[in-house]
Amino acid sequence: MSDIQLRHDWKHDEIEALFALPMNDLLFKAHSLHRQVFDPNEVQISRLLSIKTGACPEDCKYCPQSARYDTGLEKERLIEIEKVLTEARSAKAAGASRFCMGAAWRNPHARDMPYLKDMVSEVKAMGMETCMTLGMLSGTQAEELAEAGLDYYNHNLDTSPEYYGEIITTRTYQDRLDTLSNVRSAGMKVCSGGIVGMGEQASDRAGLLQQLANMEQHPDSVPINMLVKVAGTPFENLDDLDPLEFVRTIAVARIIMPHSRVRLSAGREKMTDEMQAMCFFAGANSIFYGCKLLTTNNPEENEDMTLFKRLGLHPEQGKYATVEDDKEVMAKASAKANAIKDKQSGAFYDAGAL
């Protein structure tokens, strides 16, 4: 790591001035900082698995998992630990160093916690970093997950405080900040970013990044999502964001949070190779890899590796675990799955009913 001075006092007009730079100047500034901190040709790869899909009681206007919108999404119960580990092993074999697990909840409940903690500890035993996104967390829940070994917790701010009320009404901006505070206090790393292309103004994109950069400690990982418009959601007919505005957002995030991983997240399937290359040059150095991001499509793994080869990029290397370690973990998971099979109907429930 470099000795770049980190700031937590960014003014809104300073960030807007960065967005307004000529593109070449902005990219040069972002890339120069990026090279001082990171290997510019290394990309951290994460795999995201939906461990509980649909029937969420929240009203996020971008989200097909909300029970309030008819998007044709089939709701699913919390999946078994054994299946989670099978997916984690596949992700690791494909080059992922971090495995992220997401559930469509407002927040987890007490009966969920034993299963969630088992998922964390068993995935970690495979030599992977772990991340979860489960909605809001209390301080006690954050401590439990940290004790189980959870490395990262994702909870996005979504947009600026000023535009937030146009996106969601069932959870406040302060609720999100409180969850992030609980995560950090428990000793976990924070993963927090937002979504662009939701009809916001450029000032809102600056406002989102200002909130993230002015946290007491910058998020360790900053996912920047491009809105994926899903039929049946209130945002299905919004105009597309200019791709260069997305690249600008990546570049400004890199400049004001130079030590954070900046992740290309949702919407990457619609991006051209050239646009992705610009994002990597601007400072993006993390992606989600393969299949789906919870419910939206993502580029196939072989497409990503082909692009990496063309650009001379390489994945970050994960921790090593032996074949014997993997076998032991899978055997434990199978035994646990059999032990809880009779209780499954009570344990895995419809979150939308709560």
Curated annotation (Swiss-Prot):
It comes from Shewanella sediminis (strain HAW-EB3). CDD domains: Radical_SAM. [4Fe-4S] cluster binds at residues 56, 60, 63. InterPro entries: Aldolase_TIM, BATS_dom, Biotin_synth/BioAB, Biotin_synthase, Elp3/MiaA/NifB-like_rSAM, rSAM. This is Biotin synthase. SUPFAM superfamilies: Radical SAM enzymes (SSF102114). Keywords: 2Fe-2S, 4Fe-4S, Biotin biosynthesis, Iron, Iron-sulfur, Metal-binding, S-adenosyl-L-methionine, Transferase. [2Fe-2S] cluster binds at residues 100, 131, 191, 263. Pathway: Cofactor biosynthesis; biotin biosynthesis; biotin from 7,8-diaminononanoate: step 2/2. The gene is bioB. It holds the Pfam family BATS. Its EC number is 2.8.1.6. One of its GO terms (molecular function) is biotin synthase activity. GO terms for biological process: biotin biosynthetic process. It catalyses: (4R,5S)-dethiobiotin + (sulfur carrier)-SH + 2 reduced [2Fe-2S]-[ferredoxin] + 2 S-adenosyl-L-methionine = (sulfur carrier)-H + biotin + 2 5'-deoxyadenosine + 2 L-methionine + 2 oxidized [2Fe-2S]-[ferredoxin]. Residues 41-265 form the Radical SAM core domain.
